[in-house]
């Protein structure tokens, strides 16, 4: 049984200090959206088991943070974002080739509700009420921009108490009872493993594009990892942690 999700921490400083020569393996740096945390940890283990010479290093954060790191020149071999807009920016900047982008996962929006439903949340319309403690992601990241798009399309003047930097930080606050509810992804409800209740939101499907970077220091291994992400084994791992069938 999976443990409840913990806050996402920026992993690069700790993970990238070890060089390839020290491990004797080929290092592959993968940047992934925060909502992919549990999936990527499982995918990393499976890929390394199938490729013993590979040493996958994960950097997990909000998509906007990943974008800034890539544009800032950080080392990265494969990047996976939680929406097409961020990937399009990386394509436009020349960091990623458009013909190498593929959709590796899909998801949906959901409301994570604190156990016992202290805020009496029944749907997205309750985000207009002032008395519950409600949260969303920052509009700078996909889960936040999508939430605000839903408010706008439903004509809701949302009363929001906090905007979190990524979806895992938001989910953690709901799990710990700091918030009555927050708008997350369907997969986050699954990962929470009973620590929250979930209400699905009728919203457009969320698509996760992935691509190797032009500056990859290990392009052959990056291509292998991309092929793995599109394999049936990887897709099974993704559905096991709450992502939709692609």
Regions found by a protein language model. Name each.
Residues 19-49, 55, 64, 68-71, ...:
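Exported/periplasmic ABC-transporter solute-binding proteins
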Residues 93-100:
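A short, gly/pro- and small-residue-rich
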């Amino acid at each position: 049984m999976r443990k409840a999700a913990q806050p996402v921490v920026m992993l690069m400083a700790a993970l990238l200090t070890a060089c390839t020569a020290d491990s004797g393996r080929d290092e592959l740096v993968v940047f992934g959206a925060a909502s992919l945390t549990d999936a990527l940890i499982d995918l990393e283990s499976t890929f390394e088991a199938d490729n013993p010479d590979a040493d996958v290093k994960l950097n997990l954060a909000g998509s906007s943070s990943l974008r800034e790191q890539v544009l800032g020149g950080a080392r990265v071999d494969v990047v996976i974002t939680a929406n097409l807009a961020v990937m399009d920016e990386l394509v436009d900047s020349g960091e990623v080739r458009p013909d190498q982008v593929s959709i590796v996962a899909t998801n949906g929006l959901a409301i994570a509700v604190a156990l016992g439903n202290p805020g009496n949340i029944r749907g997205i319309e309750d985000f207009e009420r002032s008395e519950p403690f409600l949260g969303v992601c920052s509009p700078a990241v996909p889960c936040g921009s999508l939430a605000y798009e839903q408010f706008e399309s439903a004509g809701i003047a949302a009363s929001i108490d906090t905007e979190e930097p990524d979806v895992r930080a938001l989910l953690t606050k709901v799990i710990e009872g700091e918030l009555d509810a927050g708008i997350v992804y369907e997969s986050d409800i699954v990962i929470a493993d009973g620590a929250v209740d979930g209400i699905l939101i009728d919203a457009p499907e969320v698509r996760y594009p992935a691509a190797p970077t032009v500056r990859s220091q290990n392009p052959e291994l990056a291509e292998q990892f991309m092929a793995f992400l599109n394999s049936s084994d990887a897709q099974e791992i993704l559905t096991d942690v709450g992502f939709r069938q692609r």
